[in-house]
Amino acid sequence: MKAILLVSHGSRIAKTKKEAKKLRDILKKRSRVSIFEYAFLEIESPGIPEGIDICVQKGASEIVVLLNFFTSGRHVDLDIPRIVEEARQKYPKVKFKITKPVGRHPGMVDLFLEMIK
């Protein structure tokens, strides 16, 4: 069973967690994926390892790590892949995929142009 784990950075600002949860809720409803969780790289909980554990406990055999990050950087290029690799070792029967940062999506140009109208 496919699961999506929406991964955000995390922040000490309380509204950040609410925004991530709201985004997850909207995506879950529109995607119709039954296992759709969220996690944070740091500061907030659940952390990425806990989010992966939750997905596996709910029956995931495949987890798509959906990056709520705009560009590449240390977290996207090093930290998150390292955490996912640790999860691969822990759950060898689970398939993992990490998406590209949102900013690499070709639709971002149109979105930005719409925002500045």
What are these regions (language model features)?
Residues 1-117:
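Active-site-proximal alpha-helix that buttresses catalytic centers in soluble enzyme cores
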